[in-house]
């Protein structure tokens, strides 16, 4: 299990993934900007290596500390003289950080860790955070959506098979159920396909397919529907945190990538939802 998870996380260091993450560095920074400043110590949990984001944070005079299990990322951080913490150091940290930031990480913990592993991980983070500190979670999620059926049309025949390949993989991995395909009067699927399903299923399809097939093996195992009850269950209830704020993020840099695969004029759901959790003092 640990080997599989390590390989998965190492895949996040590939060039395509890092380029996309760096493209959205400004959005990652905006989610925490108001909390930063002198005498603030920030842990970027599951940091990856995003030089532009790190530069933005350190320019506020915040003490930035990265944490990532990837040996490749750790080497990049070390080569660039960026402060990072090891697993052993984090396990022994107590009341050390003012802010713990998880950007596009919570859904991975939900997808890859067992229940006991999650419990242990969040207890570790709780110990590392100062009293009255803040956990900020920025992750996938359609926000408050209804269970009503909606539809999405694939952009062209050129990408029809690619989108369908994603759907089959997501179904195989129990991330979604198979959506309905719109047919003509003779019950033949209309090409390019139009899919009908609930909002959460369409959200999963859209934001997975946008990565391209090179990311299929990795991303098709992950659910992108993060909703507040999961945060309540795993952090708030066991550790006494309160969600003080949540807001939707619409990152327009995703639009041209989405339009390659789907006929849309704008982004129909948030690209991320940002949750702020306050620890009891």
Predicted features along the sequence, with ranges:
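Core SAM-dependent methyltransferase catalytic element
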Residues: 259-281
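A conserved beta-strand element that flanks and buttresses the S-adenosyl-L-methionine
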Residues: 101
């Amino acid at each position: 299990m640990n080997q599989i998870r390590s390989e998965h996380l190492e895949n996040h260091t590939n060039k395509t993934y890092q380029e996309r993450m760096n493209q959205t560095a400004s959005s990652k920074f905006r989610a925490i900007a108001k909390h930063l400043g002198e005498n603030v110590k920030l842990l970027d949990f599951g940091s990856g290596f995003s030089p532009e984001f790190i530069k933005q944070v350190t320019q506020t005079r915040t003490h930035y500390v990265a944490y990532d299990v990837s040996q490749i990322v750790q080497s990049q951080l070390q080569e660039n003289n960026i402060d990072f913490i090891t697993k052993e150091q984090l396990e022994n940290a107590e009341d050390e950080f003012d802010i713990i930031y998880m950007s596009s990480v919570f859904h991975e913990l939900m997808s890859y860790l067992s229940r006991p592993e999650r419990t242990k991980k969040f207890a570790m983070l709780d110990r590392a955070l100062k009293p009255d500190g803040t956990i900020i979670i920025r992750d996938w999620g359609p926000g408050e959506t209804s269970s009503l059926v909606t539809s999405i049309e694939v952009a062209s025949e050129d990408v029809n098979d690619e989108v369908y390949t994603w759907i089959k993989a997501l179904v195989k991995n129990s991330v979604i159920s198979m959506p309905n395909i719109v047919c003509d009067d003779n019950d033949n699927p209309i090409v390019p396909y139009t899919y009908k399903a609930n909002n959460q299923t369409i959200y999963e399809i859209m934001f997975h397919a946008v990565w391209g097939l090179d990311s299929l093996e990795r991303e098709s195992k992950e659910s992108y529907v993060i909703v507040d009850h999961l945060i309540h269950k795993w952090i708030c209830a066991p550790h006494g945190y309160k969600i003080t704020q949540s807001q939707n993020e619409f990152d327009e840099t995703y639009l041209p990538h989405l339009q390659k695969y789907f006929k849309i004029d704008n982004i129909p759901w948030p690209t991320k939802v940002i949750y702020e959790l306050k620890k009891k003092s």
